């Protein structure tokens, strides 16, 4: 299917070159499925552009990180013990880092990110030393890999990390990155110095109990802003009312805010912000639209089944759903009307794979 991609790209470039004005290039959706497939989907035609086999996946694809030039997809695979880089067009493996060794079993629990210049991967590692008679749990760490290291990449440096981290997000200036866990941590990417800690579980919001969030999906496109639903209880007199808030983190400015928007916990998984930043969309057993100007629930519809992951088109007109089963769903962003369902070839399960949006080149 790589050949068909190249022919389509050649045709598209020829048409673009002869047209009077440039037309927006279509969104491409990137997702992974069991046991070892990476799919590139043309959102404009609701069709699979390419299907790549991922070497060494060993059953499942978890987190997907896209390089800044959008040419390489970095995939967490093999029971969270290996990271591979796949050329999006050709399907060729261009990077591999085996995290574990015979002496140490290392897991990356979803959390990894890439530097804005595309030169380094930052990976959250949970190591366990394999002794002859016992397993010794070691301290978590951040490991940094050079993306040009080929198929035998080793960490070029590492530094101590907190426990219970599940999302890493690089800041656009390349100097630091965020780690989301019990709290929001910021680290210097070169020295590993902790630059600051802000509250998530330790937030200081009057009349709110300790919050909870499940932020496994590091989606920040197209705005550069990370959002996640946060569940808590708000004390009203003698009662406590279950409430959902939206966590909003601007990666460029560093601004962090929480906004209550509904008095129940129907939304617990991923959210994404619209390009105009006036709406957020969330998914679980329902599809939810949130007004992010007034921070109120706009509308909600039931879904055919649970979806774990959500993204939005670059023009803000469509919502993309995935992360479970073998279907990717397309919904109208304004009305939440279902527009199409794409069943992936072989109907293999996406499980917890990240749903990413890139652009045709």
Where are these regions (language model features)?
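Bacterial N-terminal signal peptides
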Residues: 1-14
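Predominantly soluble domains enriched in secretory-pathway, periplasmic, or organellar proteins
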Residues: 13, 17-361
């Amino acid at each position: 299917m790589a050949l068909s991609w190249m022919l389509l790209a050649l045709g598209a470039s020829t048409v673009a070159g002869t047209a009077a004005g440039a037309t927006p290039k279509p969104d491409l959706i990137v997702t992974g499925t069991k046991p070892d497939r990476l799919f590139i989907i043309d959102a404009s035609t609701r069709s699979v552009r390419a299907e790549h086999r991922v070497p060494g996946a060993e059953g499942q694809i978890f987190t997907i990180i896209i390089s800044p030039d959008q040419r390489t997809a970095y995939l967490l695979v093999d029971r969270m013990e290996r990271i591979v880089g796949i050329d999006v067009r050709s399907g060729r493996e261009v990077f591999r880092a085996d995290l574990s060794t015979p002496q140490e079993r290392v897991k990356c629990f979803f959390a990894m990110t890439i530097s804005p210049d595309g030169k380094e991967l930052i990976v959250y590692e949970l190591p366990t030393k394999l002794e002859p008679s016992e397993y010794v749990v070691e301290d978590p760490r951040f490991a940094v890999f050079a993306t040009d290291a080929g198929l035998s990449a080793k960490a070029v440096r590492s530094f101590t990390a907190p426990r219970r981290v599940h999302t890493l997000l690089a800041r656009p200036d390349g100097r630091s990155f965020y780690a989301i866990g019990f709290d929001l941590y910021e680290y210097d990417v070169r020295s590993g110095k902790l630059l600051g800690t802000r509250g998530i579980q330790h937030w200081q919001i009057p009349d709110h109990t300790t919050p909870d969030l499940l932020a496994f999906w590091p989606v920040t496109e197209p705005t550069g802003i990370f959002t996640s639903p946060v569940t808590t209880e708000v004390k009203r007199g003698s009662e406590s009312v279950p409430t959902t808030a939206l966590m909003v983190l601007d990666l460029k400015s560093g601004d962090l805010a929480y906004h209550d928007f509904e008095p129940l916990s129907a939304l617990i998984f991923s959210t994404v912000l619209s390009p105009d930043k006036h709406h957020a969309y969330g998914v679980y057993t329902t599809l939810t639209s949130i007004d992010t100007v007034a921070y109120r629930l706009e509308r909600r519809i039931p879904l055919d089944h649970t979806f774990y992951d959500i993204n939005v088109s670059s023009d803000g007109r469509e919502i993309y759903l995935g992360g479970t089963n073998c279907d990717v769903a397309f919904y109208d962003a304004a009305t939440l009307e279902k527009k199409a369902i794409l069943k992936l070839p072989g109907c293999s399960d996406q499980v917890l794979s990240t749903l990413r949006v890139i652009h045709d080149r």
